[in-house]
């Protein structure tokens, strides 16, 4: 579905490239998490895929066609701050604008709007001033605008990093569930290690290069990689890994809290 081929990019007046000969491919209906330090090239990649920056020709292909020829209508972007994407007064205005911009038949708009409001659980709030919505509701409002135009690829650039832990976890699981049900593809740029377990594939970027691509099942076998690149791993992760190693069991799944470690130990000591 998406092929990135020898993608390099250098910002104007910068001597060092932000991306260096990046190569990877994504299959349809795939959830990919991209992780790396600040300066690893994550946000640059999102900007190139989303059309905010102009990529060199013949380096990004969407369904076999150069992205510069296909355009960006099939790509939906969810950013860190929803206020950067919500420019109207109400969600209804935002939805109408998105639908008009994508050439949706005006006769179908009311049905589409009702459907997406139901999906994101914002029924009755389409005419509420956006300034009155909570941060989480605003993120769902942006997601509603994306759902309405049915993109094939969703780009999430640190979309949940400004939410508190529990709300972020609830919202991301909800959004990922909806995208999976639609059988669409998602690229999630993240600093949250537990997001990696929600993905099908993980891309580890370092200094503009693809350092490693692996599956969530191999995460605990790659802890040395995180250490080598000076990531501060969550304490529950480290504890879980040590306990699993001591018990000669393979650790799988997300470890968000110490209670997860306790539950896992109790399960394997029965």
Swiss-Prot record:
InterPro entries linked to this entry: AAA+_ATPase (IPR003593), ABC_transporter-like_ATP-bd (IPR003439), ABC_transporter-like_CS (IPR017871), ABC_transpr_CbiO/EcfA_su (IPR015856), ECF_ABC_transporter_ATP-bd (IPR050095), P-loop_NTPase (IPR027417)
CDD domains in alphabetical order: ABC_cobalt_CbiO_domain1
Highest classification ranks of the organism: Bacteria, Bacillati, Mycoplasmatota, Mycoplasmoidales, Mycoplasmoidaceae
PROSITE patterns, per the entry: ABC_TRANSPORTER_1, ABC_TRANSPORTER_2
GO MF annotation: an example: ATP binding
GO CC term, one of those recorded: ATP-binding cassette (ABC) transporter complex
Gene3D superfamilies given in the database record: P-loop containing nucleotide triphosphate hydrolases
Domain ABC transporter: 2-232
ATP-binding is among the record's keywords: yes
Protein name: Putative ABC transporter ATP-binding protein MG304 homolog
Keyword Nucleotide-binding: yes
Sorted UniProt keywords: ATP-binding, Nucleotide-binding, Transport
Binding site for ATP: 36-43
Family indicated by similarity: Belongs to the ABC transporter superfamily.
